[in-house]
């Protein structure tokens, strides 16, 4: 299971209050965590693969706020319509056909958060992305590029860029041969005549998914706005990953700006897709499965503490609104 590392100081800062350290260690299992280890400064906690919304400290804090009655009910995010587009190349249909994107405005990134973002990205690569085969994620400094954006098929020996943490411009094939990420993930695209690229309106290459980002868009502690791209072979997985990233990384940001993905072979899609799922929970069914005598009011109170919205329909029915980052919730049971 993924192990999430965080410091007490980092967590308490985002939580907005300080807990006794032992109290925190006792609470974490109540939000589905297995505490692997801890010391005076840091905690290492495991979370199940069906809860990728916990794979960054923002997701953990969001759950703790509910458990501690600091904030209950479904979180609300400021999502603003924008005119940014990401246009998909027809040639990618049989290579890596799907992409999702959004822009997160007004982030504050210190060294701890920079580390958190990188670890969050890699955890999602493993759990949702199946080690990047199904989904790959790019997180960029938005202020280094200019829209509109393009998801295009690049020519391996002609297109060139400076890969992340490198100094020299190389062709796409050279990056596959010389960069450690290129060597590790080349098998995912090397059989194709062209490779996927994310580029901006000035033809700056931002990334070669699922391999490596460009050094041009590297995140730093001066980064204020994020451009997110998620590419993959499965549209549902791509959408789920983008929604989770958008929700978590905007917890401490000003807003999320929508990006419209324009396809030549699929309906256009605007992201993020935060329209919640709505389902009914029945008191008698819940009581039978849990083995307790429950009431609609008690179920509502519990659901709100776990960051759902819930309202009473009748004495046996509670209507539940499920946020889109909770991809583990499939049905009533």
Predicted regions and their residues:
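RNA/tRNA-interacting regions in translation and RNA-turnover enzymes
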Residues: 1-333
């Amino acid at each position: 299971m993924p192990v999430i590392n965080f410091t007490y100081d980092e967590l308490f800062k985002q939580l907005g209050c300080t807990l006794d350290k032992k109290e925190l260690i006792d609470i974490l299992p109540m939000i589905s965590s297995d505490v692997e280890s801890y010391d005076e400064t840091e905690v290492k906690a495991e979370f199940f693969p069906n809860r990728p919304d916990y794979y960054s400290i923002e997701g953990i804090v969001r759950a703790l706020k509910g458990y501690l009655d600091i904030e209950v009910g479904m979180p609300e995010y400021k999502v603003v319509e924008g005119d940014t587009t990401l246009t998909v190349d027809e040639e990618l249909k049989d290579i890596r056909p799907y992409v999702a994107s959004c822009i997160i405005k007004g982030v504050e990134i210190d060294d701890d958060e920079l580390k958190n973002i990188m670890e969050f990205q890699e955890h999602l690569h493993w759990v949702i992305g199946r080690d990047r085969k199904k989904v790959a994620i790019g997180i960029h400094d938005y202020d280094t590029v200019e829209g509109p954006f393009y998801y295009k098929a690049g020519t391996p020996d002609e297109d060139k860029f400076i890969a992340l943490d490198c100094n020299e411009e190389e062709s796409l094939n050279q990056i596959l041969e010389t960069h450690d990420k290129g060597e590790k993930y080349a098998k995912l695209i090397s059989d194709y005549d062209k490779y996927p690229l994310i580029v901006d309106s000035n033809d700056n290459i931002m990334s070669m998914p699922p391999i490596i980002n460009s050094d041009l868009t590297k995140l730093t502690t001066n980064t204020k706005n994020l451009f997110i791209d998620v590419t993959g072979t499965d549209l549902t997985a791509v959408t789920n990953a983008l929604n989770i990233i958008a929700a978590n990384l905007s917890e401490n940001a000003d807003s999320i700006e929508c990006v419209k993905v324009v396809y030549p072979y699929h309906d256009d899609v605007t992201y993020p897709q935060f329209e919640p799922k709505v389902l009914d929970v029945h008191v008698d069914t819940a009581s039978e499965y849990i083995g307790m005598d429950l009431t609609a009011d008690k179920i509502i109170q519990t659901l709100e503490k776990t960051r759902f919205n819930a309202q009473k329909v009748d004495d046996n029915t509670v209507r539940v609104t499920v946020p889109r980052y909770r991809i583990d919730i499939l049905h009533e049971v």
